[in-house]
Amino acid sequence: MACKYSTLIDSSLYDREGLCPGIDLRRHVAGELEEVGAFRAQEDWRRLVGPLPKPYAGLLGPDFSFITGAVPECHPDRMEIVAYALEFGFMHDDVIDTDVNHASLDEVGHTLDQSRTGKIEDKGSDGKRQMVTQIIREMMAIDPERAMTVAKSWASGVRHSSRRKEDTNFKALEQYIPYRALDVGYMLWHGLVTFGCAITIPNEEEEEAKRLIIPALVQASLLNDLFSFEKEKNDANVQNAVLIVMNEHGCSEEEARDILKKRIRLECANYLRNVKETNARADVSDELKRYINVMQYTLSGNAAWSTNCPRYNGPTKFNELQLLRSEHGLAKYPSRWSQENRTSGLVEGDCHESKPNELKRKRNGVSVDDEMRTNGTNGAKKPAHVSQPSTDSIVLEDMVQLARTCDLPDLSDTVILQPYRYLTSLPSKGFRDQAIDSINKWLKVPPKSVKMIKDVVKMLHSASLMLDDLEDNSPLRRGKPSTHSIYGMAQTVNSATYQYITATDITAQLQNSETFHIFVEELQQLHVGQSYDLYWTHNTLCPTIAEYLKMVDMKTGGLFRMLTRMMIAESPVVDKVPNSDMNLFSCLIGRFFQIRDDYQNLASADYAKAKGFAEDLDEGKYSFTLIHCIQTLESKPELAGEMMQLRAFLMKRRHEGKLSQEAKQEVLVTMKKTESLQYTLSVLRELHSELEKEVENLEAKFGEENFTLRVMLELLKV
């Protein structure tokens, strides 16, 4: 199993008693993101739930925190929210340890059950429910399917923990272990690991996964008890293996600890045997193998963290930055981890056999292998283009010989891909990928085809954004400089066009030849729709609402319609529902998405940070809100003065290419007079209701509920 995000460290520096023999200790390169997530959770707890010690001893560690060692292959873009969720678990666990009767387990469980059904309602909820809602929402924005796994497994764990009041009288270690192995937080931990590492265990292998993981659960739970006993032994609700062994054998604490250490080493050996045997099996999926391999680092990471973490070893174990963040907050000491690093594989290696001196050589932080790219001509790997001083001979005979040589070294696609790679590196909510995954709950398109369709949609969407920003002269995209402002107009156009060509090539490789016709048809429609948007802007012509909606259907809705039609063409269950049955959903989601974008451009502070204040007015776009405003002004003679002023502003924008802040503020004042923003919001809410109804209709036609699609719609609600 390749390791992308971690490096090997010397386990003997931490696991001095050899509690995890045979398992490497790895350290995540983005441990900073874990600490940010933990401190954010602490700040939210104090704000929403109640007081918390400063500094709080949850998952933090002085050299590395818990997830950094226990999930060293967590995707960097998921690290912060995984840490937030686990820190919430630590804080909630401390409440249970203090007094299980005041832990509000039913409230947390109710919220998790809500998220499983696609409805997230936090109005009037208590602080812990609000935090759980926040966790699920953030995870849904990254990976809806695996976020649902987190919600389901966590809800099961909460229900298990609620039995603590009944299961307290354990007479023997063997009686205690089955309960404790689950209570160690396995259900939550299972969800967080599969989400963090993007693992999906097939349904038919879930029971086998539980069977294989049992030795790891026993080892982790007993090791946790070993290190936490000093902290817990005076708690009112203490349940700990050290105490149980002392009572069972009538021995001292030290003798009980020795008994547990032997059992911990035994269970570690049992789990390593399971790992080895699973890797050799041909009857299980690669995803199950990856899960079993990833879980071994829970053991080594947990052991190393437990030896010096503040939670078990006292407050002197916090490092300087942790103390500063605890005292002054994240606002003063924010993350030092760049967004570019969050989305890139940083280290290449092998999780089984790599040694510290065997890690791949790095050049400016990039693996040497990453500097090799397929050139797009014959599939051969050639070095990426790097400008170097010319060594060509200027002797005439040599130049003639060079001119006669056809087999010259290829130029790679690195240069043409740079603008595209820059755009796709910017923060994105991944809505279209989420839509494809959600719709595929019904259509059952094979994974290979799903990936190809996702790639096509990503390329087309990204290329259209590059060209849109250029055509609109937008300075920002997602809070960063737009592509053309960095690479120039010519390179941006060339890179975007290359994506259209590459997407065409991928589409031609899909199983059903009909997908190619769908692709061409919808791509033509998309460009025709864009032509009207540009035409109205250039000529300062206000379309009717019907014309605007038709333009949206062709442009924004076209991409949604394309992906649904292509998925239906590739679906093995297409006979259940004809193509036309998905048309209304595609139409509604396209219109909702565009009108929502129009509204947020004028009303959202977050949108202003990402794209600039009221940027649509700078671009001269006739948004839904502006069209309503103009039509309302034209229908009311008493507002003739405001209409003349608005026309003057629009003409000024055409000549100067933008509007001043003061002019945009005046336009917004006029929109308030016509109640255009409120009207837009009302239309959005009605459209959202229609979308929910259409999902119900589709659920009835397919005979299958679609919770992930419902949650996705819930997250889009304005």
UniProtKB/Swiss-Prot annotation:
This is Ophiobolin F synthase oblA. The lineage of its organism: Eukaryota, Fungi, Dikarya, Ascomycota, Pezizomycotina. PROSITE patterns: POLYPRENYL_SYNTHASE_1, POLYPRENYL_SYNTHASE_2. Mg(2+) 4 binds at residues 468, 472. InterPro entries: Isoprenoid_synthase_dom_sf, Polyprenyl_synt, Polyprenyl_synt_CS. A motif (DDXXD 1) lies at residues 93-97. GO terms for biological process: alcohol biosynthetic process; mycotoxin biosynthetic process; terpenoid biosynthetic process. Isopentenyl diphosphate binds at residues 429, 432, 461, 478. It catalyses: isopentenyl diphosphate + (2E,6E)-farnesyl diphosphate = (2E,6E,10E)-geranylgeranyl diphosphate + diphosphate; isopentenyl diphosphate + (2E,6E,10E)-geranylgeranyl diphosphate = (2E,6E,10E,14E)-geranylfarnesyl diphosphate + diphosphate; (2E,6E,10E,14E)-geranylfarnesyl diphosphate + H2O = ophiobolin F + diphosphate. Pfam families: polyprenyl_synt, Terpene_syn_C_2.
